[in-house]
Amino acid sequence: MNIKPFAVEEWMNEYEVGALYNIAETCVDSVSLDELFELTGENKEDFLKDFCAQRLTYGDIWGSEALRSGISKLYHTIKADEVVLTHGAAGANHHVFCSLISAGDRVVSIMPTYQQLYSIPEAIGADVAIMHLKQENDYLPDLNELKSLVTPETKMICINNPTGALMSKELLGSIVEIARGVGAYILCDEVYRHLTQEDEWCESIVDLYEKGISVSSMSKVFSLAGLRMGWIATHDEAARKAFLSHRDYNLISCGMFDDAIASIALRHSDVMLKRNQRIVRENLAILDDWIKENPHFFYTKPKAGTTALVYYDFDIPSYEFCKRMYHETGAFVTPGDCFEQPHSMRVGYACDVNTLRDGLAAVTKFAATL
């Protein structure tokens, strides 16, 4: 299968390790195991004693009951047996496409978005239609445009973007009605779900639509990207059977240690979420103040998530801007051209506060040389 290079991941692979100020990171400030046990109040010594005595088999092939039950509680209507474990959310998205999409199927995706959501179906041979989100519309989908792209042959509609836009329950409901009219699946990458700037329940697509497919992981909301634990949740039995069948070919199980640690975090999801909501809210205030103080930069203020798409008014391509800034100051952001958004950069603002402040100061310093 021929597939386009994954622009954002190639960028991260090449430059992340040597960054002095990593404000390209999209996870909420990652936790160590020591921090996890401290946050949750679980006994580290008891856990290690019990785990170290276990034989390292494949473990529960479908994931432990504790893990799947913990994930199901993140939704209103999902049951434990409606959760399929995967290798991270990236693995989940890939798994969904390879299980459900065939050459010739129509897939409607949006842009800017995570490149998986259009490059994988395109590589499979699907007919991929792109709806471009507009800054003047706060990066929210235009329902009339979406209707014009969705045909009777549409197999799937994909929702996700890196701008921090937040779709209301009413807007999601309208998208559901469009999908239901042609029997299409809706794949919603929900890795940032509940990382909002206001205290409100964020609806999941699976609680609104019988053919909704939710993808998520332990990486962003739970600050545990090192576990590589993700999942697919759906009520659709035919889709779930396809996921499990394909899973036998490429996963088998998720690993006993990952399962055990993820189960701890999920048991205390309220504590983990409270910590991370505090971080994204306090840090976005810092980024927003920086935007106000630097007239060469502008953005649509995020309402959710951990990233912001920040535009600049310098006459310089985003790859050149970001490379020069990286080499001259050590500040590391993601070029907007990775998302086909020229003259912009994606800033991850959920890192530790000192990295964020120092990174933004480095951007200011670099901008002064242009």
Language-model regions, residue ranges each:
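A short helix->loop->beta-strand "cap" motif at the edges of active sites that frequently abuts
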Residues: 105, 126, 181-184, 210
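Active-site phosphate-binding strand-loop segment of PLP-dependent enzymes
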Residues: 135-197
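PLP-dependent enzyme catalytic core of the Aspartate aminotransferase-like
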Residues: 77, 108, 148, 324-333, ...
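Structural signature of PLP-dependent enzymes
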Residues: 243-247, 265-288
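Active-site PLP attachment segment
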Residues: 207-241
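N-terminal small-domain helix-loop-helix segment of the aminotransferase-like
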Residues: 2-88, 95, 268, 369-370
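Conserved PLP-anchoring active-site segment centered on the Schiff-base-forming lysine
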Residues: 81, 99-121, 134
